[in-house]
Structure formats: C-alpha cells, structure tokens
Amino acid sequence: MLTINSTIKKFIAIMISTMLLLAVYFSKESEAVENQIEFKEMVINGDVGHEDKKLIREVNPNYRNIQSWISSVGAAVAINDINGDGFSNDLCMVDPRFNNVTVQSLIGEYEKFQLESTTKQTIAPMGCVPADINEDGRQDIVVYYWGRSPLAFIQKETSDPLSSESFQPKEIVENIEMYSNTLTFSDIDGDGHLDMVVGNYFPDASEVLNKNSVKKPLMQDSMSQALNGGTNRIYLWSEDQGDYLYKDVSSQVPDELLNGWTLGIGVADLNKDGLPDIYAANDFGPDRLLLNKSQPGNIDFTSLTGKKDWKTPRSEILGLDSFKGMGVEFVDLNRDGWLDILVSNIAEEYALMESHFAFINTGEWEQAEKGIAPFENQSVELGLNKSSWGWDIKSGDFNNDGKNEVIQATGFIRGEKEKWHELQELATINDELLKYPNSWPKFIPGTDISGKTENAFFIQNTKGRYGNYSDVFGSSEKKVGRGIAIADVNGDGLLDFALANQWDQSSFYLNKSKVTGNFIGVDIAYSTYLNQDSLKIKEGKDSTKKRHAVGASLEVYLPNNEILLAEVDGGSGHSGKRSHEIHFGIGDIKKKKYPARIKWRDVNGVLQEKNIEVTPGWQTIWLPMEKGEK
C-alpha cells in the first residue's frame, strides 16, 4: 500500500510540474509576437439628439426579475455592397437603444436612413442580412426579430442615392410570433437559389416582450442539456408559394437541430461535396453539426458528433458539449484546404470556467458514414480557449502576413453590482427549478456580469499559438460586444471591421496598418447583366449589377504548398454579417499568378468546377448564367 501511495504521489508531482512548465511555455509563446496591426476607431451610431433612447427592454411580467438577462441581445451589424458601387462600404445595423434598423454609407455617399420599423413594443429587430433574394442584381435586406418572422426589404429598381424610399417591405414567409437570434442564407437543397436558415431562442408565441401578458413563459430546462427552446427553421426558395418567396420545410429538419436555445448558425460546405452543412451554436446545451445530403426541393441531413477519446472531456466533443454556444465561424486556420470551425462560449478565467472551441477539420470524411464528425478541438493548443463571455467570432488576415487573426465580441451585462457569484449558484440549481424564472436570482438594471471585459483580438505568433491583443480596439471604455462584420471597405486590400455593442455606441475600425503583406481578393458573382456563356475574370472591383454567388468556394495553391480555402458567406455567425468577398493574405510571396480551383452551383443548380488562375489584388470572377465549363 505504501508503494502504491508513493507511486501515486510521484505521478501527481510529475503531472503538476508538467502542467506548470506547459503554462509557462504557453504564456511565453503567446507573448512572442509584435503587434503591427493598427485601426482608426469611428463611432457609427451616436446618441446626440436622441432623448428617446432606452437601456432596457419592457418584458413579460414573468421575466421582470431577470429583465437585464432578457435584454442582453439585439445589437447587430452587417457590411456589404448595398448600393452597388462595387465596394462593400454600406453598413446596416440594429441599435436596441432605439429599437430600429438603419443603413448608412461608411464613405458618405448618402445620408443615413432608417428602414421602416415596427411600432409595436412587443417586437424587436435582432439583426439584418444583405442578400439578393429576388435575384435582380440588387442587394435586399432581410431583418429578423423577436416577436415575428423575418421581414424582407426589397430594393427597388430606382434607388440612387439610397434612402428609406429605396426599399419596399415584403413578407417572404408566413408571419408568426417567433424569437430569432440569427439568420443566414445558402443554397441548402442545391437548386441554384438562396434558402434561409433561422436560429430561434425562445419558443414560438412566448410573448417575451409583452409587458401586459398573462402568459408565463419559461427559461431553459437545463444549463447543459436544454432542449425546450425555440424551433429552428429552414425555408426553401420557391416559385410556387403564392404571396411568399420561401417555403417552410422545418418539418423535415432532424430533431437535433430543432429546439436548442440557438444563438449562432453557420452554413458551409465542410466535406467538399457541394452542399452546405449546418452548425448550430446552442446556449445551455450541445451544439449540432448536420451533414447535408439534400436534393432540390427535399432536405436531408445526418447528425454528426465528434469521436470520444481518453484525452478529450465530453464537454468539449463536438455535438456532445455542454457549454454555452454563442457564435460560430468557418475558416481554414491551418491552410490545409479544409474549413475549420471556431465557436464562442463562456470562457472567463473564473466562475463558469468553460472554453471556446477550435474544431480542426481532419479531412477524414469517411468517418461520417459512422456518424462521426472528423474534427478535433485544439483551442487550448492554439491559445484560443480563453477570453471572456464570448458572442460573435470572426476571422481574417488583417495585416496580410499569411496568418489569420481572430476577433471576438465579449461581455454580458454591464452595471454596478457584481452578480457573478449568484450566476454561479444558479448554475448549480436543480434542473426542475431552473426553468422557472422566479427561482432565479434578480438580474435587474444595475446588475453586472462580465460587463467590464475587453473584446478579444487574437494574433498568431511564429510558433502557431495565439495571444489576445485587445489593445487594438483603442477605446479605453469597456463595452459589451455582440456582432462583428468584416469587409475591405475602401478596396486597399486591408480588412476593416465593425463591432456592434449592446445598449451603447458601436464602432467601425478602419485598418491603418503600415507593415503589411500581399493579398488575393476575389468577388464571385453571376453575370446576370453581361450575357456571357463562360467564366470570365476582370481585374479590380466592378460596379456592374451582380448576384453574389453565395456558397461558391475558392481554393488557391501557394508555392509553399499551403492551400487557401474560403467560401462566399451568406451570413453565418451570431449577429454580425461579413461582406460577400473572399480575401486571403499571402505575406511576402510574390508571383504574378496563382493556380486556383473554383466550385459553384449555376443558376440551374448544376454543380460546376473549374481550374483558373488568380492574381494579387482585387478581381471579380463573373460566372456564366447557364451551365458552365469544367
């Protein structure tokens, strides 16, 4: 017995020493980088002259003792080319202080204006997504809400300069009382048209924002396995829907996607079969990954989960996790030609000590036949596991050095009275009581839970590990962030971004970095108005009316054997929506042309692939409208 105890003690001592050495090593590694990325911060939603601003929502009486918790979402931002000048310099944002949706030019091309807003206090916009849903070559805007179904604002033919009169509100689905926190577009069934995926939070008809309601809506029924949330929905584009543009096919959705408390939805082709797969980031329960096997008009998904092994806790296995999923991002972090998945959770250094995820795609997709998701969480090894209370997460190469940075919006409720300890107690409550709001601590105005943290900006060092350099945000005032939108606003090859803050002013960050590398930038669109029958590449930006090829992918092959991969994004994430362009930083590599392969679905739904060459700088790839070349 003494020998066993002695052996155990030695083993424990060795393990502790090893962990301490690793901690020192990792901390040194994360510091070994010189930050040369600089931004100029500009406020995009000032409150001067607005006496009607609010800092809390009116809520259902059953939620009054957790009013600040219920009021913690709604700030959102999107950057895109809405006015069709060829540059993604238009910004759409939701400001919960005024319960409105506004559109503005980041370069002053037109006056800031408000989209027609609801006058009902029981309805609140949660985000806006630019998309050409009627396929006329002009960007429309789809707004999603708490309290109703998504509503489209269709851009009219004569809309120069842009104004509120440029958009016509249109119901595109049957209007019901639903509570959406995220929405994205992609061609789910492969028919050549954009479909809509909506992530919902509260159950339908909960009357969350009705201060006079007699209903008694509930909260989650578990902190780790909650399945009593809102019903997520998939809407397919349809020509025969009468008054509506989209058909609700949610009855065909697997149960795994349906009723989590969803805060983030991501859609991308993870296995390279030409169909976009779905990742749902769920609060209070396991995230979900659905492998897409759909055919035109008929959706078909298979749920995948990560493989269990001795070194990975169940709480960090894809599809089995118990963390608080907030945002999701697809990026090929290791440049091996496979899209990886970044996920925001709650990852403070204390209290609810969870972890963010960096699921690295192994490319072993034959495992999917056994229901296994071929991903390994490497957030700890990469240094991406900790920051704060995470929301939107986005990635891009902001100094074009060939290594992607990662931005994360963080923070929960800002106030004067620290309530972390009460939240910690709530996390241990019996699940049978958790769903009843009156059993919760009081989270009312004045509450502070992770309200004084800094948004995260992760930069990778030469050893491959990331360190958090939040000083790039500039402002000394700490705010709680929600949505992030990335775009090259002025076409200089440097990525800029906007960050929407909850109950506060939000900011746009213009990239002013001086030490930068080379880049490849590509705008992929259908040649709706060029009448061409083959793929063509035009140097630079192009203001010709275009229908962006959402879901199209581009692989670029570098002489150092790295493979660059990205897709045209249709709105993945939490409440931030990036522009439709693809951007790669390539460091100091200098060649006139780079071999590449583009994959897309033509407007008839036929999957196309073509070997091409791309050049440094911006270029526009015009896709043929009919069946293209291989």
Could you say what each language-model-derived stretch is?
Residues E38-L55, N65-W69, F113-I123, Q168-Y179, ...:
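Short loop/turn motifs that recur once per blade in beta-propeller domains
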Residues D90-D95, D140-Y145, M196-N200, D277-N282, ...:
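Hydrophobic beta-strand segments that make up the repeating blades of beta-propeller
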Residues N99-L115, S149-P169, V208-M223, N228-V249, ...:
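Beta-propeller blade repeat segments, especially FG-GAP/WD-type strand-to-loop junctions
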Residues V73-G84, A124-E135, I154, S180-L194, ...:
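Beta-propeller blade termini
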Residues M178-T184, V197, S322-K417, K479-T516, ...:
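Repeat-solenoid scaffold signature
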Residues L2-S68, S72-A76, Y110, W365, ...:
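Gly/Ser/Thr/Pro-enriched helix-cap/hinge segments flanking short amphipathic alpha-helices
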Residues Y201-L227, S344-A351, F412-I449, L530-E539:
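Short, conserved, GDST-rich strand-edge loop motifs in beta-rich repeat architectures
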Residues N80, V94, A131, Y144, ...:
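Surface-exposed loop and edge beta-strand positions of immunoglobulin-like domains
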